[in-house]
Amino acid sequence: MASKAAPSCRLVFCLLISATVLRPGLGWYTVNSAYGDTIIMPCRVDVPQNLMFGKWKYEKPDGSPVFIAFRSSTKKSVQYDDVPEYKDRLNLSENYTLSISNAKISDEKRFVCMLVTEDDVFEAPTVVKVFKQPSKPEIVSKAPFLETDKLKKLGECISKDSYPDGNITWYRNGKVLQALEGAVVIIFRKQMDSVTQLYTMTSSLEYKTTKADIQMPFTCSVTYYGPSGQKTVYSEQAVFDIYYPTEQVTIQVLPSKNAIKEGDNITLKCLGNGNPPPEEFLFYLPGQPEGIRSSNTYTLTDVKRNATGDYKCSLVDKKSMIASAAITVHYLDLSLNPSGEVTKQIGDALPVSCTISASRNATVVWMKDNVKLRSSPSFSSLHYQDAGNYVCETALQEVEGLKKRESLTLIVEGKPQIKMTKKTDPSGLSKTIICHVEGFPKPAIQWTITGSGSVINQTEESPYINGRYYSKIIISPEENVTLTCTAENQLERTVNSLNVSAISIPEHDEADEISDENKEKVNDQAKLIVGIVVGLLLAALVAGVVYWLYMKKSKTASKHVNKDLGNMEENKKLEENNHKTEA
């Protein structure tokens, strides 16, 4: 009995000693685990053949041991100690590997695997490190706007539930922001939850912005340590509205200042290039030193030509920052004299003037009965064809809608004028009698036979054009007759007669009246003939001059030749006389 008790005593003593003293030479082993994962700790001791059982313990901060798991090598049974924080979380395998589910920060301890034989205790320590990835950093408490040249809190970067704690870095357009006195102020804080032991990191950024920061993205990141090493997580980008003062004022004129005409409404719009743009301005009208306070627009209604001038606007609190625009209110006046309906007598003179007054050169177009005229009408002696509806129209091409027009309806009146002609048909069986009538209003024509007073109704009339038309009858008189043509309008009654011989008696035919159109053709032909004659005369004159010059030159040459021949004759005679004398 005594011999059996001795080994048991030695075993208990060894367990007590090993609970406080780690056997040297086994070294340290670290297991890294992510928060919430299962911690797996192999027992790094070779299992001896005479193993009795294995145990796991951990050490408190004061070094005292806490046993948590036991496994017998003979009974193949597992027992877990009543440790509240590890209840239902432990699993000890046959090879004495200890697994702890749902890893927590409090699991960061030194665990020891103990394999016990009758003679010895073998131990292997394992250090557990638990890591918790922080939440994605977020920029919160963001400033609604930043102001240039003012140090202002931009926002806070926050990342939660980290273990161990991490570092926060700020970036502007992807580049790290370093603290700079008076321009970049970064304050970092961290806080640990007493229950979860997880850290929350917060970094606030105060920043003095410039206009270069417009549309620039700001981000932050958290750098932390995980089971596999160091990692970095970035926040979403944040872009801030940058407020900056107005540096320039501009003025706009609506509609376009090149197309303003009398009667238009003008809207002046003043703009500042600051952010936010100014909401109020002072507007200065031509000749008014005091500005009118208004929003960024000021409207003038039904403007007149005297509104032409320089318009200005400025900031309310900085009147020296001013902008101006020159505005011309275009106008167009037209005066037609005479105008309306005018009645004149044929042969009268009628001066017509269309006077234009405009803000710039205007185009003038004359129309007669909707047909464009080549030049302004001028009437020194009115004709019936001058009657019609005349329109003087003017416009400013650069200003849409600015045009004026006045009309003149000219009526040319005249008493009836009659001319009668007769012509025998080539067959000799009939005669054509024509009564040409001129006058306005249109005269009525009546044919009668003098003596009998009979009225001839079978007539043929031409169209009434330019105050003229004719009435024609065809007769075959067996005896001499006198025909009377009567033309009558509101002005007068005119009568003319023509003697017509019997069809059997030959007589001289009278030429037909030449129409206005034929007159123009005759005039054109006459002009052409005159031009040809003048051209021929000029050609003959030039030819005569050339011939005269030629003849004059020829006579001069003949004189020189005759003179030379005379001199030769005289010299010959002198030589002959000299020979005779010598003989």
Curated annotation (Swiss-Prot):
Ig-like C2-type domain sequence ranges: 245-328, 333-409, 416-501
A Pfam family annotated for this UniProt entry: C2-set_2
Main location: membrane
Subcellular location: Cell membrane; Cell projection, Axon; Cell projection, Dendrite
Post-translational modification: Glycosylated.
Transmembrane parts of this sequence: 528-549
Residues exposed to the Extracellular side: 28-527
Intervals, Cytoplasmic compartment: 550-583
Residue span(s) of domain Ig-like V-type: 28-120, 125-234
One GO CC annotation: plasma membrane
Disulfide bonds: C43-C113, C157-C220, C270-C313, C354-C392, C435-C485
Biased composition (Basic and acidic residues): 569-583
Recorded topology in the membrane: Single-pass type I membrane protein
Keywords: Adaptive immunity, Cell adhesion, Cell membrane, Cell projection, Disulfide bond, Glycoprotein, Immunity, Immunoglobulin domain, Membrane, Repeat, Signal, Transmembrane, Transmembrane helix
Top-rank taxon, per record: Eukaryota
Glycosites: N91, N95, N167, N265, N306, N361, N457, N480, N499
Gene3D superfamilies recorded: Immunoglobulins (2.60.40.10)
Location of the region described as Disordered in the Swiss-Prot/TrEMBL record: 562-583
Repressor found in the keyword field: no
Tissue: Constitutively expressed in the autonomic nervous system. Sympathetic and parasympathetic nerve fibers but not myelinated nerve fibers in the spinal nerve.
Subunit comment: Homodimer. Interacts (via extracellular domain) with CD6 (via extracellular domain). Homodimerization and interaction with CD6 involve the same region and cannot occur simultaneously. The affinity for CD6 is much higher than the affinity for self-association. Interacts (via glycosylated extracellular domain) with LGALS1 and LGALS3. Interaction with LGALS1 or LGALS3 inhibits interaction with CD6.
Function text: Cell adhesion molecule that mediates both heterotypic cell-cell contacts via its interaction with CD6, as well as homotypic cell-cell contacts. Promotes T-cell activation and proliferation via its interactions with CD6. Contributes to the formation and maturation of the immunological synapse via its interactions with CD6. Mediates homotypic interactions with cells that express ALCAM. Mediates attachment of dendritic cells onto endothelial cells via homotypic interaction. Inhibits endothelial cell migration and promotes endothelial tube formation via homotypic interactions.
Domain notes from UniProt: The CD6 binding site is located in the N-terminal Ig-like domain.
Name of the protein in its database record: CD166 antigen
Protein species of origin: Bos taurus
Gene responsible for this protein: ALCAM
